[in-house]
Amino acid sequence: MARYIGPTCKLARREGADLSLKSPARALDSKCKLEQKPGQHGASRKGKLSDYATQLREKQKVKRIYGLLERQFRNYYKKASTKKGNTGENLLQLLETRLDNVCYRMGFAVTRPAARQLVSHRCVLVNGKSVNLASYQIKAGDAITLSEKAQKQLRVQEALTVAEQHDMTPSWVEVDSKKFSGVFKAVPDRADLPSDINEALIVELYSK
C-alpha cells in the first residue's frame, strides 16, 4: 500500500500544524516553520481560504495524522455516517480504535507510523492472539501485549520512557510498562480527543 515517505516537516508545514509524526522527545526542527507553506512561494501565500479549501485542509490534516489514504479515510466516514450519534465524533472514535493508534496511545511507539510497523511485523497480540492488521478495531476490554521479541527492542523501551516522561497516556487506556501490556478501557468521548481537530468541517466536505 502506498505510504508517504518524504520529509515529515513538509507535511506539517502544509497543514500548519504538528501532526505528531515525530517523537515528542525530538521537537520539530526550528527550520520547520509551520506558519509558512512548503514550496518556492510558500512565504508569500496569504489570503483567506474558501469554505471548501478550509474543509479540504482539515480532512487532509486528519488523514495525515492517522496515516491514511483517501479511500481508507472515506470508508471510515461512510461507516461513521451509518452509526447512531454524531458522524464527526463517530469518525474520530473509529480512527482512535485502530490497533496501530491504540499501540501509539499506549506508548509502545513514539509515532503512529512506528506503531503500524510493530503491528505489521506481528509484534502485537490482542487478547493473546497475534494481529498484524493495523486497521483492526479494538473494543473496550481488549488486552494489548507486545511479543517477547518486541519487548527486547530498544526503540520500544525508549518509547515507553518517552510516554511516561511526557505524560502521553490518555485516560481510556491502562498501561503496565513493566509487562509491555495494556488494556483498552473504553472508547473515548469527544471531550477526551484532540481539541485541535474540527471534524465538523470534514462532515461538511463529504456531505456535499
Curated annotation (Swiss-Prot):
Which NCBIfam families does the record cross-reference, listed alphabetically? PRK05327.1, rpsD_bact
State what protein this is by name: Small ribosomal subunit protein uS4
- InterPro entries linked to this entry: Ribosomal_uS4, Ribosomal_uS4_bac-type, Ribosomal_uS4_CS, Ribosomal_uS4_N, S4_RNA-bd, S4_RNA-bd_sf
Which UniProt keywords are listed?
Answer: Ribonucleoprotein, Ribosomal protein, RNA-binding, rRNA-binding
Q: What is the scientific name of the source organism?
A: Xanthomonas oryzae pv. oryzae (strain KACC10331 / KXO85)
Under HAMAP family, the record lists: Ribosomal_uS4_B
- GO biological process assignments: ribosomal small subunit biogenesis; translation
The segment(s) forming the S4 RNA-binding domain are: 97-160
Similarity field: Belongs to the universal ribosomal protein uS4 family.
UniProt xrefs under Gene3D superfamilies: Ribosomal Protein S4 Delta 41, Chain A, domain 1 (1.10.1050.10), RNA-binding S4 domain (3.10.290.10)
Q: What SMART domains does UniProt report for this protein, alphabetically?
A: Ribosomal_S4, S4
Can you state the subunit structure given in the record?
Part of the 30S ribosomal subunit. Contacts protein S5. The interaction surface between S4 and S5 is involved in control of translational fidelity.
* Gene Ontology cellular component list: small ribosomal subunit
The function of this protein is: One of the primary rRNA binding proteins, it binds directly to 16S rRNA where it nucleates assembly of the body of the 30S subunit. With S5 and S12 plays an important role in translational accuracy.
Q: Name one GO molecular function term.
A: structural constituent of ribosome
UniProt lists the gene as rpsD
